[in-house]
Amino acid sequence: EFIDNAEVLHVHSGETRHYSTTESSRISVWSAKNAVSNQIIFTTYHSLHRIQESGIHVDTIYFDEAHNSVQKNFYQSTEYFSHHAERCYFFTATPKHSRTPSKAGMNWTKTYGQVICQVPAPKLVNQGYILPPKVEVYKTRILEKDELVADRDSEQMIDAIDNLKKNKVLICAKSTKQIVNLVSHTKFVSELAWRGYSYMLITSKTGAIIDGEKVTREEFFDVLNAWGQDPDKRFVVLHHSILSEGMNVKGLEAVLFMR
């Protein structure tokens, strides 16, 4: 069964070809105008409270990477929809529990309910759904006099890429600033180009960028998908936060943690 009359709204600050707003009044108006249609709303934990403030009715809500929902800034909206939506589901590979009543945890059954399904990671590995990682450790060196941290980061990332000899690499940085410094203030990009690599980055502050050119969010993920399926294409994806939650990089061969 397929729904062919769904209207789509995005409630976040990212770029999209669909109608997008973070104003609660506009969310309410949009919902009323499309009352005869099925409505699909995409939002972030940062903007979830805007939907709550709009006062619209939500039938079903899915919380992806739901361990984030226990954060102090997000929990109030999470609790609200848990109690007001007709169906509420939480998905995470890393559930966060709490042993104190002053800090929210996913073991709070009044909000999160009971566990419907839980699969141990070793079982997923054994059945081939998850590939076990092969960890390689690279020792860092101390900064030389007057040397910029970004220059050392660039040297280490290029050395690691050379040693790995992989075509598709994800680099996880600790902040957007670290990514910007690496790309804008070092020889990192030119060193990649010399080796035949393209580069991509996407953050809420910089937007989506491919080889120095700003593109839309949709273009970014279309290219990411195409390059991921091309066995001969060499590229590096830069993103912040561990393992770049929410990004599906097809064909990914290695992850470098820039710390």
Where are these regions (language model features)?
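Conserved helix-turn-beta segment of the N-terminal RecA-like "Helicase ATP-binding" lobe
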Residues: 1-26, 190-191
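Conserved RecA-like ASCE ATPase "motif II neighborhood" in helicase/translocase motors
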Residues: 28-77, 239-241
